[in-house]
């Protein structure tokens, strides 16, 4: 295999894939990125058996082939190479040579056939949503996602799509976050859709979502996976196969106390109070805080 890339274009494709590459795994193939030639360029694939990404990059293909190159080393090499053309060449002994100008590196590659089979990147249900809208919803609830909780559904965010209304819920047994908003949706499915996505997968998805108002992403729901189809890349993740908790019963139907407070001063006060209350419990930060309400005044103590 011999291919020639523009360095910055290849590096821009490789960096987002590092979050879906398995680190220190007994299966060497999933510690790398599969580079496979195709018409007009190359397809890069990364998959850690839970989440993955496929990206198409334009390049000059001199000799066809498909090989797995260590993701960490590949990104480190590309960072230090000079701008311009980068040549990747693999010989019959599976030695990959990465060169640019007078600089060159040699690594060991694995045959592309060792790479795990990717799930089918198609779904029965499909809808399109603005990237900024989806980003807003995820950001509003990510803080309450559990980490390594024995109840698997709490380690993710529960999404419900009903018409043009999208609801996102997270709960770590201490906190519950809910974000509901009307979105500009285009859907090929008339009924309600719901699914639970792992928090780790959403962390990587946030890195891909654009903040522009005009950008959208097509989402396809398969039996076990959900696929996010961007313009030149596809991100997919396994869904959490579990029923979500009945979160609505934790939200009071009626309230005796209503308080309105200015946001910025309240946030600054919470930040100061949290300096002496934070403690780590099972990998999560817990911050007990006492709120005292009097007429015209809210006192925070810790």
Label every model-predicted segment.
Residues 1-302:
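Structural preference for solvent-exposed beta-strand-turn elements
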């Amino acid at each position: 295999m011999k291919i020639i890339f523009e360095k910055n274009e290849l590096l821009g494709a490789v960096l987002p894939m590092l979050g879906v590459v398995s680190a220190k795994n007994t299966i060497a193939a999933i510690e790398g990125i599969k580079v496979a030639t195709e018409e007009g360029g190359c397809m890069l694939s990364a998959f850690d058996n839970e989440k993955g990404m496929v990206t198409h990059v334009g390049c000059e293909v001199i000799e066809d082939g498909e090989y797995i190159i260590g993701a960490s080393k590949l990104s480190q090499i590309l960072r230090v190479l000079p701008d311009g053309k980068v040549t990747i060449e693999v010989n019959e002994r599976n030695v990959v040579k990465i060169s640019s100008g007078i600089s060159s590196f040699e690594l060991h590659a694995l045959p592309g056939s060792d790479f795990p089979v990717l799930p089918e990147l198609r779904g029965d249900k499909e809808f399109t949503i603005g990237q900024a809208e989806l980003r807003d919803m995820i950001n509003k609830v990510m803080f309450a996602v559990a980490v390594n909780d024995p109840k698997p559904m709490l380690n993710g965010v529960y999404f419900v799509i009903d018409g043009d209304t999208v609801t996102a819920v997270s709960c770590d047994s201490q906190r519950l976050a809910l974000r509901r908003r009307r979105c500009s949706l285009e859907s090929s499915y008339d009924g309600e859709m719901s699914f639970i996505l792992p928090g780790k997968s959403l962390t990587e998805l946030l890195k891909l979502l654009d903040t522009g108002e005009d950008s959208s992403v097509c989402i396809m729901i398969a039996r076990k996976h959900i696929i996010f189809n961007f313009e030149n890349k596809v991100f997919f993740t396994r869904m959490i196969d579990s029923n979500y908790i009945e979160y609505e019963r934790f939200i009071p139907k009626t309230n005796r106390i209503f308080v309105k407070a200015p946001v910025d001063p309240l946030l600054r006060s919470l930040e100061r109070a949290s300096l002496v209350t934070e403690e780590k419990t099972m990998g999560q930060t817990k911050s007990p805080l006492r709120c005292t309400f009097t007429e015209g005044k809210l006192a925070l103590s810790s």
